[in-house]
Amino acid sequence: MLKKAQEDPSNHYYLVIEELNRGNAPAIFGEIFQLLDRKDEDEFPAEEVGESEYGISNYDVAKEVYGDENHPVRIPSNMNILATMNTADQNVFTLDTAFLRRWSTRQIENNFEKSEHSKDMIDGTKVSWGTFATVINDMIIDSNTDMVSSADKCLGIYFAKKKELDADKFSEKVLKHLWDNAFRMDPTVIFNGSCKSLEDVVSKYETSEADKLESVLRTEVYEKMLLKMKQRNIENDEK
């Protein structure tokens, strides 16, 4: 890609890295780390703005890209690196300040109103995916106010796909996460007294002929979801 970008300056090229902090990024980038500093318009002429401020020596790369093994290797101005990362995830590497300062970062809001299927109903219930997740996330934050990792346990807008709202998939994917992770220390915060184990939750949810969520959630939690559903319906009617 570096060679293509170098030879085609009229077009933009993007290297996309998913979950950047899943690995030891500085170690993975190696000497390329130095190329992340780009020339600023306040300090360099227009024709140089955007390219790497500092070059590195790499004979093999230089020969392939420039045809000259002694040519300093730089990222051209028409090549950008885009990366995603979950700063709340506990099972990742911490990125040091020196590495992070070389990036322009943007916080992505976990807004269920932007989810394509937030208004889709969870199979066998009277509750939509967006309403369910919003109520649960509020409870996760409230019950983990003294824990830095509470955001890590929240449901993201892409946590469950539309097909995973089906009864046989929802319990195994979403309810399992709530039992095993989000409310691991005290599942009774959201699950009713008849659910003594995850097996009970899955079994009752999948076999219930009534509202499936009502069969496993605490009454006050379920009613909170119904109330939010009612409020959203009123808001939609007013629009």
Give the residues covered by each predicted segment.
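C-terminal regulatory/interaction module of P-loop NTP-utilizing enzymes
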Residues: M1-K239
